[in-house]
Amino acid sequence: MIRLALILAAFALPIPAWADGTLPPAPLANTQLPDPRQEAAAKALMETIRCLVCQGQSIADSDADLAGDMRALVRQRIAAGEPPAAIRAWLIGRYGNWVSYRPPL
């Protein structure tokens, strides 16, 4: 019985190492788009979206991992030609009105 407990304990110890959250940032999280007009549109939109982790910073200013993922998503969609209003609507639909500094009335 003690041997079984030791074996189970040995398998449980490495789990925190697997749960390490040191993934690299999303590809476009900290990289600007090559087209200056698209980057300006993305930046303008990112400044109006609230970071869900920092609660007071926009995703443009936040260093949180979630904000980086959201910046990458905004840049990817802008680069694909999606209008900022559609991206904002998608983010509000996914995260709720609180994500926007200018929620719909």
Regions picked out by a protein language model, each given a short descriptive name:
Residues 4-6, 13, 51, 57, ...:
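Residue-level marker of intrinsically disordered, low-complexity segments enriched
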Residues 17-57:
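Membrane-proximal low-complexity regions enriched in glycine and acidic/polar residues
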Residues 70-99:
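Extended, hydrophilic extramembrane loops/domains of integral membrane proteins
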Residues 101-105:
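Juxtamembrane/start-of-transmembrane alpha-helix segments at the extracytoplasmic/lumenal side
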Residues 46-76, 80:
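N-terminal, post-signal-peptide region of Sec/Tat-exported proteins
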Residues 1-22:
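Hydrophobic secretory-pathway targeting helix
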